[in-house]
Amino acid sequence: FGAAVIGRVLEAEGYRVAIVPQPDWHGDFRDFKKLGRPRLWFGVAPGCMDSMVNKYTANRRLRSEDAYSPDGRHDLRPEYPTIVYSQILKRLYPDVPVILGGIEASLRRLTHYDYWQERFRPSILCDSGADMIIYGMGEKAVVEISNHLQMAIEDGNAHLNYAEDGTARVGMKTFRDVITHGHCIPQTVFIYNKEDIPGGIVPDDLILHAHETCLKDMKAQAENFRHIEEESNKYHAQRIIQPTGGRYVVVNPPYPPMTQDEIDHSF
């Protein structure tokens, strides 16, 4: 499972990791609060299968069991858990960065067709309120992000919050300064205002049809899909930018493929 692998990778780098599996999203959200505010960031990864495929059949009937839940229970995760969990975390901890990962976020990083709702939806960053996506294999990105934030704390450059025990905790200002606008980390997705895009829009960027154009023209979405798939399979991909709702979804190119030693280290 991805969350377990990512947790072990971060532990190997010296970070302390807590995993809350299938938190209860009803009532007082106690599962989201039981471990308190994290020092660096929240990660949301709703599973190794798309949640809607896991919950419903192709005929849109509720599946009788969930193969990835205790006792096969199918009521332990909501529909679109990435969106539900992220919105709850932002409501409870608005100043803590929320990072999305896993197949659900990766497949929805740009305009996409939702089979269940029969309509095009924008990047999941728009619906969830999260701060960034790590798409694909996330081992390198989570370590790089965490290291940059840790270095900002150690250098005294961070806008910090402090726990009762004096532990420094990263807030959104630090995250924006160090990650969103400071380092161009591969395999990540952000939403920017045009003037805030790192380096500005350059000729090498691949500019997709705007989300609003795709809503009116299915051929525009088909062209976007072809470009996205082509760039996903290139060794040296372009940065992808899509105008969405007056802002810009920016997809940074992926890391080079992991070497055998790197894969062995992760697993």
Regions found by a protein language model. Give the residues of each.
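Alpha-helix boundary recognition
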Residues: E11, L125-C126, F267
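Long hydrophobic segments that form regular secondary structure
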Residues: M258-F267
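Short glycine-/small-residue-rich flexible loop motifs, especially phosphate/cofactor-binding loops
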Residues: G7, P122, I263
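Solvent-exposed, flexible loop/coil residues
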Residues: V5, G245, E262
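Glycine-rich beta-alpha loop elements in corrinoid/cobalamin-binding modules
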Residues: G2, P21-T244, V251-N252
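Short helix-loop-beta junction
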Residues: V5-V17
